[in-house]
Each structure stands twice: as structure tokens, then as C-alpha cells.
Amino acid sequence: MKPSIILYKTLPDDLLHRLEAHFTVTQVPNLHPETVARHAQAFASAQGLLGTSETVNRALLEKMPALRAASTISVGYDNVEVDALTARKIVLMHTPAVLTETVADTVMALMLATARRVVDVAERVKAGEWTESIGPAWFGVDVHHKTLGIVGMGRIGMALAQRAHFGFTMPVLYHARRRHQEAEDRFNARYCDLDTLLQEADFVCVILPLTAETRHLFGATQFARMKSSAIFINAGRGPVVDENALIAALQNGEIYAAGLDVFEQEPLSVDSPLLNMSNVVAVPHIGSATHETRYNMMACAVDNLIDALQGKIEKNCVNPQAAG
């Protein structure tokens, strides 16, 4: 008899068929309590769980006593109580490598769009304001040869440093938990403490996961240390930034502009002051959102679950100790 799994994400037919070749699949729209109650027997017997964006917590796990592996279609997993999974010897799989280049493209796009005011001036053209040769009121600032500060030198940070160094001749500073020799050798990146990075960088790009240590790592003190000409980019997790402090820094001219792919609350409230600022480029968490990469992420998550339920967790496992 095939193992049974719960699927809470719509997959392309070919990937669904791949799952069905290995498992008995129960598809549900979400992991809300009423959904779990409606499919109580399927949840109780499921050995695998596959999807994204829903909360996976102790309350859910109590309804899934047979669960052995969970696979998220994402690199981040702050919506999952990893400690609770580990305590129950449930492995968590994620999709870190397949989205690296696409997210780095998004970060670079935010840097360019914000510095060159692409969104702002495009909207002015559409509004009929381009009636004569443009003057300084339409100008942005250069990106090439400016100093880039990367906070979080993981895979995405490395891909961003590559683009900045080779494509835009940007000096690269970085701050991370540990030195990254490859970044220093390949991109002449300079490791520094966070305060130094904030004081020297023209672009501060945050690519951090959300942890107890990184929550509100960026607040009023950090924005005050940045150049008034600095551009702040957040493509990690929204709660890494105190959004009220960011709004105040933008309103007070402490920093020049911001490009944001993530927010403290998502979707972003229509009442957010950020939406009324011409020096803010705000996009709806599109970091990995291309057709190609989202498909590859789903395929990776499917393969991860198949591997995990066969005892193969050599790659893409968040908590390998759970299998011990």
C-alpha cells in the first residue's frame, strides 16, 4: 500500500502525477482547522505534507500522528514550528538552491528601479506629465560604481554580489554571521561589522531569514547610521525591519529611498504610508515569482518529499537531526 500524503497546494498535472506514482494523495485547499476536521482521517494517516504559506504548528501536528516528513515549496520556513517537528522526529524539507538566481535578479531590479525612479517617472508619463524635456525633478541617481552593502551573504547574497561586482563595478561590503572567503576572493568583497556597513554603503540590501535574532534588526538606530543618500532594499523577510522606523526614516529624509519586496504584514495594508511615497518601490513578495522558478520550486519540493519518505535527506533538509 502506498503511503498517504496531504497536498495543500495546486500543482501542475505532471508533478501531481509524479506524486501519485508514489503516494495516495489527498488534496485540500488549506490547513485551516475546519479543513483538518473535514478530512480528519486523511490527516491522521498521512505520512507526508506538501505545500506552502500555511502555518504548520503543534496544533496541526497533534492531528497528524503518522507524519514523517513535511515539504515546503519555499526556502523560508518561518511559518513552520521547526522545533515541534523535530521533537516528533518529523523532517522538514525546503527548496533553497532553485530560486537563488531569480531572487538575485529581483534584488537587482529593486536597486535599479529605486535609484533610477523607474516606477515613479513611468507613472508620471502615463499621467500625461511629460510635456517637455525633463529636468532635475525627474532625475535619479547612478547605480554603477556605488558601494553595495549586503546583509546576509548566503546563496542569494553571493549571486547579488556577482551581479554588482562584474555587471556594475560596485565595491561590495558584507555583514554575515561568519566570513565568506569565496565572496572575498571572487568579488573582492570586504567583511565588516553592521555599523560600518551602514555608514559606508550607498545601497543596503537585506537578505536575511527571520529568526529571534534578526527580528527588527533594522530600526531607528540603524537607519540613523545610514547615509542620507542611501537606498535601502529588503528582500529577506519583512519583520527583520521595524516598518514604522523605516517609514519615519523616509519621511524625515534620513535615507533617500527604499525598494521593498517583503513587509511586516502581507499583503501590505492599503493604508500604509509606504504606498504614498514616490521614493518607495513596493512589490508583492515577488522574489522568486517567475513561471520557470516557481515550477522548479514545486518540482524540487515534490522530489524532496519523495526522497524524505524513502529516508534520503542528504540535501535540502532543515532539521536532519529529526531523523537521528
From Swiss-Prot:
Alphabetized UniProt keyword annotations: Cytoplasm, NAD, NADP, Oxidoreductase
CDD domains: GDH
InterPro entries (UniProt xref): D-isomer_2-hydroxyacid_DH (IPR050223), D-isomer_2_OHA_DH_cat_dom (IPR006139), D-isomer_DH_CS (IPR029753), D-isomer_DH_NAD-bd (IPR006140), Glyo/OHPyrv_Rdtase_B (IPR023756), NAD(P)-bd_dom_sf (IPR036291)
GO cellular component terms given for this protein: cytosol; plasma membrane
Localisation per UniProt entry: Cytoplasm
NAD keyword on record: yes
EC number from the UniProt entry: 1.1.1.79, 1.1.1.81
GO function terms (MF aspect): glyoxylate reductase (NADPH) activity; hydroxypyruvate reductase (NADH) activity; hydroxypyruvate reductase (NADPH) activity; NAD binding
Catalytic activity: glycolate + NADP(+) = glyoxylate + NADPH + H(+); (R)-glycerate + NAD(+) = 3-hydroxypyruvate + NADH + H(+); (R)-glycerate + NADP(+) = 3-hydroxypyruvate + NADPH + H(+)
Active site residues according to the UniProt entry: R237, E266, H285 (proton donor)
Subunit structure: Homodimer.
HAMAP family: 2_Hacid_dh_C_GhrB
Cited NCBIfam families: PRK15409.1
Family of the protein in this entry: Belongs to the D-isomer specific 2-hydroxyacid dehydrogenase family. GhrB subfamily.
Cited function: Catalyzes the NADPH-dependent reduction of glyoxylate and hydroxypyruvate into glycolate and glycerate, respectively.
Name assigned to this protein: Glyoxylate/hydroxypyruvate reductase B
Annotated organism of origin: Salmonella typhi
Gene: ghrB
